[in-house]
Design a protein with these regions (language model features):
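Surface-exposed amphipathic alpha-helical tracts and adjacent flexible/coil segments at the periphery
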Residues: 1-22, 27-34, 53, 59-69, ...
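Glycine-rich, positively charged N-terminal anion/phosphate-binding segment
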Residues: 38-57
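Glycine-rich loop at the start of a catalytic domain that most often binds anionic cofactors/ligands
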Residues: 41-46, 77-83
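Phosphodiester-processing cores and adjacent nucleic acid-binding clamps
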Residues: 50, 63, 82, 96-97
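Gly/Gly-Pro- and Ser/Thr-rich, intrinsically disordered tail segments characteristic of DNA damage-repair
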Residues: 77, 112-123
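Alpha-helix capping/helix-boundary segments
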Residues: 100-101
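Conserved phosphotransfer cores of two-component systems
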Residues: 109
Length: 408
C-alpha cells in the first residue's frame, strides 16, 4: 500500500515557518545561527525554535533542525549543548551530514530522529543501509539520482528507512553541493553555509597567448556565458512518479527564500500532491493547471526536471536572470464585514487589479475601490512599508492570506 508522502518546506525564519505550516506543509526544516548550511542573517534563535515547534505541533506538523555543516575540531565542543538545546526546544529530527555529528546527536539527544543530509551524497542502497545501521531514520538522497535508481534504493533498503528527495527549488552545479568554487574565488566556504554562488557569475574564455581578449562561449543577450549556472528544479508535473518510486518526503529547497515564496510553492505542491493522493493508482496523472500558474507567480529561474530522467537539460541555463512577473504587496491580517485588514509589503494604488492567495489554496481577484489607512484616512495608494490599511472585499478572507499584483 502506498504511504502518504510528507511535504517538507524550508523555513529561514519563524515567520516563514508559520506560513509554511499554514499553507500545507507537513513538516518544516530550519536552522539555528550555527551548523545549518545557511550563514544568512536570518535564522532562528533557540526561543524562536521553541515557539515554532509549539506552533507546528499544535497543528500536527513536525520541525526538523539542520546540523549539516562539516564542523572543525574547534567547533565540536559547542555541539553537545547545541544539540540538547534544540532537543529541549522540541525538534522532531536533526538533519546531519557529518558522521561525528551523527554520533553526538545519538549520544546527547537519543530521543530525536536523525536524518542524513543530501550533503552526505547518498547515491546507492549500500550507503543508505550503512546510515540505517548507524541509527538514521531517514536519508536525504543525492540530487543527481534518476527515478530508476531511487526505486532500486527503495527496493533494497529496510522499509522503515525513510527516503527524502528534493522536488523544487535552486540546484547546485556541484555533486551534492560539494563545491570549492566559493572558497577558492571568494574565501567563503559553501560547505559551511557561506556560498557566494560563483556558479551564477558570467564567464568568458581567454586564450593564454591573447591576454585581454575575452571570447564569448555562447550567445546571450547581455554577452558572456553562464556555463556553470543551474536551472531551478520543478517536479510538479511528475510528482506521481516520484511518489511511486518510493520517496517518503518531498523536499522544497529555499531556506534563504521569502515567506511569500515558500507559502506560494508549498500551496502549489500541496495541491499537486493531494491531486495524486486522491487517485494514486491512476497511471494518467493530470496536474491541475493552476499549480503551474501558481509556481510561475514566484521569483524563479527557468524550470527543469533536474536529473530525474537523466542528465540532459538538467543544469545549464543561458542566463542568470530570474523570472519575476509578479510583485508581493501585502498580507491579510484579518477580515470582517466585507473589509480586509492588511499590512503593506509593497506599493499598489486604487484601481489596480490584485490577487489574494489564501492558505487553503484559493485565489481571490479584485480591484479595490478604495484604500483606508489605520486612522481612517482615505488614500490613493499604500506608500509606506509595513503600514496598516483596509480595503473592501466581499469574499471572506483568511488570516495569513497573501496579496500580489502582476508587474506592469
Amino acid at each position: 500500500m502506498l504511504q502518504q508522502p510528507e511535504l517538507l518546506a524550508p523555513a529561514g525564519s519563524l515567520e516563514t515557518l508559520k506560513y509554511a505550516v499554514m499553507y500545507g506543509a507537513d513538516a518544516v526544516y530550519c536552522a539555528l545561527p550555527e551548523f545549518g548550511m545557511r550563514a544568512a542573517p536570518v535564522n532562528l534563535t533557540v526561543g524562536e525554535l521553541h515557539e515554532g515547534c509549539i506552533f507546528a505541533h499544535a497543528r500536527g506538523k513536525k520541525v526538523y533542525l539542520t546540523l549539516n555543516t562539516l564542523p572543525t575540531n574547534e567547533e565540536l565542543s559547542k555541539l553537545p549543548r547545541y544539540i540538547q538545546d534544540a532537543a529541549e526546544a522540541g525538534v522532531d529530527a536533526f538533519i546531519i551530514a557529518d558522521l561525528g555529528v551523527l554520533a553526538l546527536a545519538k549520544k546527547y539527544a537519543p530521543q530525536v530522529e536523525r536524518h542524513v543530509s543530501t550533503q552526505a551524497g547518498i547515491t546507492n542502497y549500500e550507503a543508505a543501509k550503512v546510515c540505517y545501521e548507524l541509527g538514521a531514520k531517514r536519508v536525504v538522497l543525492a540530487r543527481e539520482l534518476p527515478l530508476t535508481e531511487i526505486a532500486q534504493i527503495r527496493d533494497n533498503c529496510p522499509q522503515d528507512l525513510e527516503l527524502e528527495a528534493f522536488v523544487h527549488g535552486a540546484m547546485c552545479m556541484s555533486v551534492s553541493g560539494r563545491c570549492l568554487l566559493s572558497s577558492y574565488m571568494a574565501g567563503r566556504s559553501g560547505n559551511r553555509g557561506e556560498c557566494a554562488q560563483p556558479c551564477r557569475w558570467k564567464y568568458s574564455l581567454v586564450e593564454e597567448h591573447r591576454p585581454g581578449q575575452y571570447m564569448e562561449i555562447g550567445e546571450s543577450e547581455d554577452n558572456g556565458s553562464y556555463i556553470l549556472n543551474a536551472n531551478d528544479l520543478c517536479t510538479a508535473p511528475f510528482i506521481d512518479l516520484i511518489c511511486k518510486a518510493g520517496v517518503d518526503s518531498l523536499k522544497i529547497e529555499g531556506r534563504a527564500k521569502t515567506f511569500y515564496y515558500v507559502a506560494s510553492v508549498v500551496s502549489a505542491y500541496r495541491r499537486a500532491l493531494d491531486t495524486f493522493l486522491a487517485d494514486p493508482y491512476n497511471d494518467s496523472f493530470e496536474l491541475p493547471d493552476d499549480v503551474i500558474e501558481e509556481l510561475n507567480r514566484t521569483s524563479h529561474r527557468h524550470y527543469s526536471p533536474g536529473f530525474y530522467f537523466g542528465k540532459e537539460q538538467a543544469q545549464q541555463t543561458p542566463s542568470h536572470t530570474y523570472v519575476r512577473d509578479w510583485d508581493f504587496i501585502g498580507t491579510v491580517d484579518s477580515w470582517e464585514n466585507g473589509v480586509a485588514h492588511c499590512t503593506q509589503r509593497g506599493k499598489f494604488a486604487v484601481g489596480d487589479s490584485i490577487e489574494i492567495l489564501q492558505p487553503d489554496g484559493s485565489v481571490v481577484k479584485l480591484t479595490p475601490a478604495w484604500i483606508e489607512s489605520a486612522d481612517g484616512e482615505r488614500m490613493d495608494a499604500t506608500p509606506h512599508p509595513m503600514m496598516q490599511y483596509t480595503i473592501p472585499c466581499e469574499t471572506p478572507l483568511m488570516a495569513y492570506s497573501l496579496i500580489r499584483m502582476q508587474k506592469q
